[in-house]
């Protein structure tokens, strides 16, 4: 946010209050302008429709938005289904789901941790 980026959270959680509890415990609630939970929307990532409220809210073309997530088959494929870029956090790269999808779903960028995100985003317009 300090660098001018607007942040929203899209979660596949089945229980909306649980998402807020976890965010409060991690002191992350204030980082996000809006939070969308599949339990409320009725669709889960990778379905493109879970991204539609965020696209409407931020009022930007999908090509100007990116999904940052650690699951290729949900987060990155979902971003692509919605016309967005996908940035893969590789901390869970060895999970069976990610191993299965590694050769089929290609993110626009990969980072090992969220600490790498600000430098990546500073150069993002030049990379796209």
Where are these regions (language model features)?
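Asp-based, Mg2+/Mn2+-dependent phosphohydrolase catalytic module
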Residues: 5-6, 10-128
């Amino acid at each position: 946010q300090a660098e001018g980026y607007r942040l929203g959270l899209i979660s596949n959680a089945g229980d909306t209050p649980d998402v807020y509890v976890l965010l409060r415990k991690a002191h992350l609630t204030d980082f996000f302008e809006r939070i969308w939970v599949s339990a409320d929307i009725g669709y889960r990532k990778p379905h493109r429709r879970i991204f539609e409220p965020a696209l409407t809210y931020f009022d930007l073309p999908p090509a100007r938005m990116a999904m940052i997530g650690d699951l290729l088959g949900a987060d990155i494929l979902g971003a692509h289904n919605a016309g967005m870029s996908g940035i893969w956090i590789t901390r869970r790269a060895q999970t069976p789901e990610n191993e299965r999808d590694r050769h089929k779903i290609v993110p626009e960028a990969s980072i090992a941790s969220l600490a790498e995100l600000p430098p990546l985003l500073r150069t993002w317009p030049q990379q796209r």
